[in-house]
């Protein structure tokens, strides 16, 4: 039996190294695609971000062809997602549960799911909302990244609460429905 030539060994070593590097790069990109921080950032450390142009409201076109002013006359909870982000389904469900609880209790706040991928169609987003059993959740496509830039949101699965004055009072990754409700109450709901 003959052993492989030195050239064949080097070729195999290069191929293995290239595959390992490709796997590491793929893993890094996959992990960074969805936020993984499950702790809420304290308002004191993050509330100041995204407030430079906070006094002026943006009118957002919703998927149901209505509009919503953000910030409006009541606190707003905005959840940034993409249909392709598996982790985002849980955060969107939490947003919908918080919206239903507020509605049932007669409390006033705006709830908005913001799709960060401008290439996803209205139909795809509606199917996603149906899939997570939140078909009534108000949603929009962040065309031109207007909302994500204004509020400095770079990661999927990020939820922010914006007070009526325009100040971001809460920022977290995939918070629970209770955490969203508490943050909205602190913002004046």
Curated annotation (Swiss-Prot):
Role this protein plays: Probable mercury binding protein.
The name this protein goes by in its record: Mercury resistance operon ORF3
GO CC annotation: extracellular region
Domain Thioredoxin: residue ranges: 38-189
Protein's GO biological process: response to mercury ion
Keywords per UniProt: Mercuric resistance, Mercury, Secreted, Signal
Subcellular location: Secreted
Entries under InterPro entries matching the protein: TAT_signal (IPR006311), Thioredoxin-like_fold (IPR012336), Thioredoxin-like_sf (IPR036249), Thioredoxin_domain (IPR013766)
Signal peptide: 1-27
Main location: secreted
Keyword Signal among UniProt keywords: yes
Record's comment on post-translational modification: Predicted to be exported by the Tat system. The position of the signal peptide cleavage has not been experimentally proven.
